[in-house]
Curated annotation (Swiss-Prot):
GO terms for biological process: negative regulation of DNA-templated transcription. It comes from Bifidobacterium animalis subsp. lactis (strain AD011). It holds the Pfam family HrcA. Negative regulator of class I heat shock genes (grpE-dnaK-dnaJ and groELS operons). Prevents heat-shock induction of these operons. This is Heat-inducible transcription repressor HrcA. Residues 298-318 are annotated as: Disordered.
Length: 366
């Protein structure tokens, strides 16, 4: 589509339809928007947009509504991301402050995202396999058993038993921990296992080949035993107030139960280029039958490429951006959702979560 005027008309139709969920006529566009042409010219342009697949006419005498192609063009080329209001930013900050645990934080994040968008919100727990190791401790439990306590960058605390032929003393255990922390900090569990296997052993210092290999094996096991991410949700009831066709609601709610499918979709969307870390799937783009009349907006959160960000004042295209998201956050609503607001809200909450996890919180033990 090359006509600037047609682009303006498409944008006006999408924005007006998002607001009122009623077919948009040429007369209404001429009266409301300063397009500089007559209703007849607008009507001709709308007919051309319909021929090109961007608009459709639900009834012969009615105006036009956007198609999936129209929404996609709007999201890619027309929708101007907007910063959240000071009140919305403060509500996010307040919601994520003072939580008792990581689970509590993620549930709060889902609730505040649902509140801002008026839609269904999903927040996944950090993936263990994607997390980075912050610190390890070794604690003696029995004659041939050590407790390996691993803390990730997200504050997740993982405890595993390590069997050893010879139990190192307290001083030796401390030295072993210091060595592992020096070589493995900010590595994934897989990288930790690989790094530990290359460390020189010191049998006199308690770091025997058997103990080294046992610790490396524990990290490998933690990498391989990854369970499906826990998903925190909020706002399912709000979808019943979103002008979604009644026949589409049951399949939509069925789709929301398929958490593994939703997780895979959200992770796929985080890799979309050109969306400032926010991915959007519209209708059939979700490849999920129950979401044919819905859209999914998703972003990753977690380990960031920069050490800090002033998230209190960040806008849509600034702030801490995850280099390798360890979890995802998303919003599901009708295809006529307010994309600009939803994308900004998903982006903002994901950045707040990234910063919140970086600064630290109470550990999530398992």
């Amino acid at each position: 589509m090359s006509s600037t005027r047609r682009m303006q008309i498409l944008r006006a139709v999408v924005e007006d339809y998002i607001r009122q969920q009623e077919p948009i006529g040429s007369g209404a566009l001429a009266a409301k928007h300063h397009l500089g042409v007559s209703p007849a010219t607008i009507r001709n342009d709308m007919a051309a947009l319909e021929d090109e697949g961007y608009l459709t006419q639900p009834h012969t005498s009615a105006g036009r509504i956007p198609t999936e192609k129209g929404y996609r063009y709007f999201v890619n080329s027309l929708s101007t991301p907007i910063p959240l209001t000071a009140e919305q930013r403060e509500s996010i900050s307040s919601a994520l402050s003072g939580s008792a645990s990581l689970q509590d934080t993620l549930q709060r994040a889902a609730r505040i995202l649902s509140t801002i968008t008026g839609q269904y919100a999903m927040v996944s727990a950090p993936s263990l396999s994607r997390s980075l190791m912050r610190h390890v401790e070794l604690l003696p439990l029995a004659a041939h058993t050590l407790l390996l306590v691993t803390i990730t960058e997200t504050g997740r605390v993982v405890q595993r038993l390590v069997s050893t032929d010879t139990l190192p003393n307290t001083e030796q255990t401390q030295c072993i921990c210091e060595t592992i922390n020096t070589h493995c900090r900010l590595l994934t569990f897989r990288q930790c296992a690989q790094s530990i296997r290359t460390l020189p052993t010191d049998s006199e210092g308690g770091f025997t080949p058997q103990l080294r290999d046992a610790i490396a094996a524990v990290f490998s096991d933690m990498e391989n035993e990854e369970r499906p991410n826990e998903l925190f949700t909020s706002g399912a009831a709000s979808l019943t107030h979103q002008h979604i066709d009644a026949a589409s609601l049951a399949p939509l709610f069925d789709a929301l139960e398929e958490q593994v499918v939703l997780m895979r979709l959200m992770y796929d969307l985080t890799g979309q280029p050109g969306q400032e870390g926010v991915g959007v799937a519209i209708g059939s783009e979700t490849h999920t039958p129950g979401l044919l009349h819905a859209s999914v907006v998703s972003s990753g959160y977690g380990q960031s490429s920069t050490p800090s960000a002033n998230v209190e004042h960040e806008e849509y295209d600034t702030g801490t951006k995850p280099t390798m998201p360890i979890a995802v956050i998303g919003s599901i609503g009708p295809t006529h959702m307010n994309y600009a607001v939803t994308m900004a809200a998903v982006h903002a909450v994901s950045r707040y979560l990234t910063e919140f996890l970086r600064v630290g919180h109470n550990g999530w033990q398992e």
